[in-house]
UniProtKB/Swiss-Prot annotation:
Tissue: Widely expressed.
Summary of the function given for this chain in its UniProt record: Required for dynein-dynactin complex and NUMA1 recruitment at the mitotic cell cortex during anaphase.
Molecular function GO labels: actin binding; PH domain binding; spectrin binding; structural molecule activity
Lineage start: Eukaryota, Metazoa, Chordata, Craniata, Vertebrata
Name of the featured protein: Band 4.1-like protein 2
Cross-link named Glycyl lysine isopeptide (Lys-Gly) (interchain with G-Cter in SUMO2), sites: K140, K144
């Protein structure tokens, strides 16, 4: 018993140790061990196994505790009689059930087989079993409390002790397996979590990187019209519209459709930023530098709703004028400069403004002290004008300049001759040597296209033509051709259509550009402007000296050669004509100058270059090169012009419509040859006329100054020649290009890279009006051609309109002679009409009569008339009846008036060496006509080469119509003095004052 007890005590110790360990590891094991101890009573019978078995079991337990989770080799130490149970236990464990009773039963049966000879112990075991059975429920519920009861039992059964190690082994295995699995699961989960966290972090990093990439910004710098710079940061892939909107928001500008952003692609090429495309794609590798400019010049700035919009337009025009892109006459420079001072400085104050140095302001490309004095003098007369009113007056005068709103592009015709293509609100203009030689109104253009570096326009056939003609031009490169094409598409859409045209639907494998203007049209813009409802925005006007940064600084004589250098795509195209020449263009109604009322209606054939060139030389081969000409034409007083603005358009139209049949008078008959040529109006005839005139006048480098007083007409010699020249140019119809242009029409458009067929949807039927107007102009030139200098200019007016010649001068003179003496009423009417037409803004060249007329400043009294031969004969005059038919004499009637003439001639004893002999080679010839209320001035400029020496001859004829007597001597002296003042570098060779008095009616001497 002692041995048994000792072994049992050892087993208890081991079991208690195992139980403690198990309890530490997991509380559930303790409950399971206690349940095993309270098993069936049969287990106690086997509580006395052989000592060897007990020692083996204790060893097994010890080894089991020491072993790691890899306890798979433990079966080697288990006796054979336990192996089955082990496997069974494992199965049960695997099943995961807590069924330990079957295992205990197996152990008990085996023990009973071996322990049969101990009946007493069996009885004791049974008793204990009964007691244990009673406590079974309590053991399950109170696991922790059973622990002490089990340890206090006096005779625990050996079977119970032996079974504990086996169950513990299996449980430990199960636990270890579970732990291993859990560890693996936890490890896997941890790994997954780690991976997920890492993945999320990586994704977050990538996302943040992407975000930074998407939000990567580029700094943009935009130079504004007042010279300041606006900077902003834009997303790299932002479209042009984003930047444009930011700039307009910064400027507080709502009427923004007239403006755009320019970027410099090359030193000579500027492009408009397309708002519908990404900026990055358009700039490529260029810096993000832009300039804010006017893209579409409003034909009538007075229709703009807000003052701030007009202010920005003023700033743009000041830049254009100061840089030479918008040529002006001296008087126009002075007048516009005075309005600039009034807008920026306010009313003239002797104390405050007397000491201001006007040289700080830039009014013209080449500013002289004389101009500054004139500006200051005119500034005093604007007292009371608010800045907004001054800006409005500035725009009213500037809009009539011939080059207003013209975008010039370099090109060559089919013969390789350098020309310029100008795009404006009315159509496409063709210039050669700074003279406008043709005009294609939008209604006459059927299709615009480009292929590689060629640009084509398909023109609607004329009345007598059966087929359409295509005219081609060669541009410097493909990009220049595409740029010109896009500008044409945009201008046509903006000015002529009611709404933008939708781009063509993409077709499979189609060629050509799909570009279409996507912004608002002028009609839509005006409609939107009427909806603007906000207080007038406050803005500060800046000094005009900012314009000086774009100046050429070229001398007046050379100015025209490079004035356009900084103009996008038109470098050196236009020169700012000498201070006085520009005004001619102002009168041009059609092309360069837009009528306030119906900008698109005029067929205009005038020169755009026209300030100086306003003169149009007829012949295809004769073009005026005025780089060395320094003639200064003064514009008609602006006040007078403004008074007639309201009725100018009507008068012009009426004047053009009336086409009186010209009849030659006595004096004209003597000069039949030139007249006949003039009548023809063709380019060939023009050439002949020019040659004839050249023979008659060119040889001498002299200046003939004739002053005609009281309706006297001066020698027609120079006049007719001038008229003829102009007329040939007039003849060119807008439908036909100059010879070189038309010849290029043969090129085909089959594979045009870009194609655009303008839809002539005009807002109010302006197209029809324009077409009719053009047709009238075309027809008139022929009959009008017959008109002589002295004849009423009305008939000639129509040809002049196209030719832009000095015809007006003639008409005015004749008409006024008759009207002044015989029909005062008619005189005033006609005079007013002519004055309005010619001086419509002192810059506008009336298409009808004065294509080349420049306004004469009211101040300018130099009535210097160029005449090679002063006529002293009876003059037959034709009265021009206004469309209004106010005159008593019908336009078609040719009244013959008896007149008395008186001529005073002054000839300089020194005549230039080359004056007499060889006439030399005629290089250029120009005729400029300007008119004021009572004075008509015609200037003829010819440039010839004799023996390698270049000669410039200026003949100026001034006709003064009035009822009062004029001192001839004083007029002669004044003419000489003014001629010398205007051209100090030239000598006056001849001055003729011719007075013609109508005896029949007035009886004046």
């Amino acid at each position: 018993m002692t041995t048994e007890v000792g072994s049992v005590s050892e087993v208890k110790k081991d079991s208690s140790q195992l139980g403690t360990d198990a309890t530490k590891e997991k509380p559930k094991e303790v409950a399971e061990n206690q349940q095993n101890q309270s098993s069936d009573p049969e287990e106690e019978k086997g509580s006395q196994p052989p000592p060897a078995a007990e020692s083996q079991s204790s060893l097994r337990r010890q080894k089991r505790e020491k072993e790691t989770s890899e306890s798979r080799g433990i079966s080697r130490f288990i006796p054979p009689w336990l192996k089955k149970q082990k496997s069974y236990t494992l199965v049960v464990a695997k099943d995961g059930g807590d069924k330990k009773e079957p295992t205990q039963a197996v152990v008990e049966e085996q023990v009973l087989d071996k322990e049969e000879p101990l009946p007493e112990e069996q009885r004791q075991a049974k008793g204990d079993a009964e007691e244990m059975a009673q406590k079974k429920q309590e053991i399950k519920v109170e696991v922790k409390e059973e622990k002490p009861s089990v340890s206090k039992e006096e005779k625990p059964s050996v079977s119970k002790v032996e079974m504990q190690p086996t169950e513990l082994v299996s449980k430990e295995r199960e636990e270890k397996v579970k732990e291993t699995q859990e560890d693996k699961l936890e490890g896997g989960a941890a790994k997954r979590e780690t991976k997920e966290v890492q993945t999320n972090e990586l994704k977050a990093e990538k996302a943040s990187q992407k975000v930074t990439k998407k939000t990567k910004t580029v700094q943009c710098k935009v130079t504004l019209l007042d010279g300041t710079e606006y900077s902003c940061d834009l997303e790299k892939h932002a479209k042009g519209q984003v930047l444009f909107d930011k700039v307009c928001e910064h400027l507080n500008l709502l009427e923004k459709d007239y403006f755009g952003l320019l970027f410099q692609e090359s030193p000579e090429q500027k492009n408009w930023l397309d708002p519908a495309k990404e900026i990055k794609r358009q700039l490529r590798n260029l810096p993000w530098l832009f300039t804010f400019n006017v893209k579409f010049y409003p034909p009538d700035p007075s229709q703009l709703t807000e003052d701030i919009t007009r202010y920005f337009l003023c700033l743009q025009l000041r830049q254009d004028i100061a840089s030479g892109r918008l040529p002006c006459s001296f008087v126009t420079h002075a007048l516009l400069g005075s309005y600039t001072l009034q807008a920026e400085l306010g009313d003239y104050d002797p104390e405050e403004h007397g000491s201001i140095d006007l040289s700080e302001f830039q009014f013209a490309p080449t500013q002289t002290k004389e101009l500054e004095e004139k500006v200051a003098e005119l500034h005093k007369t604007h007292r009371g004008l608010s800045p907004a009113q001054a800006d409005s007056q500035f725009l009213e005068n500037a809009k009539r300049l011939s080059m207003y709103g013209v975008d010039l592009h370099h090109a060559k015709d089919s013969e390789g001759v350098d020309i310029k293509l100008g795009v404006c609100a009315n159509g496409l203009l063709i210039y050669k040597d700074r003279l406008r030689i043709n005009r294609f109104a939008w209604p006459k253009i059927l299709k615009i296209s480009y292929k590689r570096s060629n640009f084509y326009i398909k023109v609607r056939p004329a009345e007598l033509e059966q087929f359409e003609s295509t005219i081609g031009f060669k541009l410097p490169n493909h990009r220049a051709a595409k740029r010109l094409w896009k500008v044409c598409v945009e201008h046509h859409t903006f000015y002529r259509l009611v709404s933008p045209e939708q781009p063509p639907k993409a077709k499979f494998l189609t060629l050509g550009s799909k570009f279409r203007y996507s912004g608002r049209t002028q009609a839509q813009t005006r409609q939107a402007s009427t909806l603007i409802d906000r207080p007038a925005p406050h803005f500060e006007r800046t000094s005009s000296k900012r314009v000086s940064r774009s100046l050429d600084g070229a001398p007046i004589g050379v100015m025209d050669q490079s004035l356009m250098k900084d103009f996008p795509g038109a470098a050196g195209e236009i020169s700012a004509y000498g201070p006085g020449l520009v005004s001619i263009a102002v009168v041009q109604d059609g092309d360069g100058r837009r009528e306030v009322r119906s900008p698109t209606k005029a067929p205009h054939l005038q020169l755009i270059e026209g300030k100086k060139n306003s003169l149009r030389v007829e012949g295809d081969n004769i073009y005026v090169r005025h780089s060395n000409l320094m003639l200064e034409e003064l514009d008609k007083a602006q006040e007078d012009i403004l008074k007639h603005q309201a009725s100018i358009s009507e008068l012009k139209r009426n004047f053009m419509e009336s086409t009186p049949e010209p009849r030659p008078n006595e004096w004209e008959k003597r000069r039949i040859t030139p007249l006949s040529l003039q009548t023809q109006g063709s380019s060939h005839e023009t050439l002949n006329i020019v040659e004839e005139k050249k023979r008659a006048e060119v040889g001498k480098d002299e200046r003939v100054i004739t002053e005609e007083m009281n309706g006297k007409e001066i020698s027609p010699g120079s006049g007719p020649g001038e008229i003829r020249k102009v007329e040939p140019v007039t003849q060119k119809d807008s439908t036909s290009l100059s010879s070189e242009s038309s010849s290029s029409s043969s090129e085909s458009e089959e594979e045009d890279v870009g194609e655009y067929r303008p839809h002539h949807r005009v807002t109010e039927g302006t197209i029809r009006e324009e077409q009719e107007y053009e047709e009238e102009v075309e027809e008139e030139p022929r009959p009008a051609a017959k008109v002589v200098e002295r004849e009423e200019a009305v008939p000639e007016a129509s040809p002049v309109t196209q030719a832009g010649a000095s015809v007006i001068t003639v008409e005015t003179v004749i008409q006024e002679n008759v009207g002044a003496q015989k029909i005062p009423g008619e005189k005033s009417v006609h005079e007013g009409a002519l004055k309005q037409d010619m001086g419509e803004e002192a810059e506008e060249e009336p298409q009808k009569v004065n294509g080349e007329v420049s306004h004469v400043d009211i101040d300018v009294l130099p009535q210097i008339i160029c005449c090679s031969e002063p006529p002293v004969v009876k003059t037959e005059m034709v009265t021009i009846s206004d469309a209004s038919q106010r005159t008593e004499i019908s336009t078609k009637e040719v009244p013959i008036v008896q007149t008395e003439t008186k001529t005073i001639t002054y000839e300089s004893p020194q005549i230039d060496g080359g004056a007499g002999g060889d006439s030399g080679t005629l290089l250029t010839a120009q005729t400029i006509t300007s008119e004021s209320v009572s004075t008509t001035t015609t200037t003829h400029i010819t440039k010839t080469v004799k023996g390698g020496i270049s000669e410039t001859r200026i003949e100026k004829r001034i006709v003064i119509t009035g009822d009062g007597d004029i001192d001839h001597d004083q007029a002669l002296a004044q003419a000489i003095r003014e001629a010398r003042e205007q051209h100090p570098d030239m000598s006056v060779t001849r001055v003729v004052v011719h007075k013609e008095t109508e005896l029949a009616e007035e009886g004046e001497d």
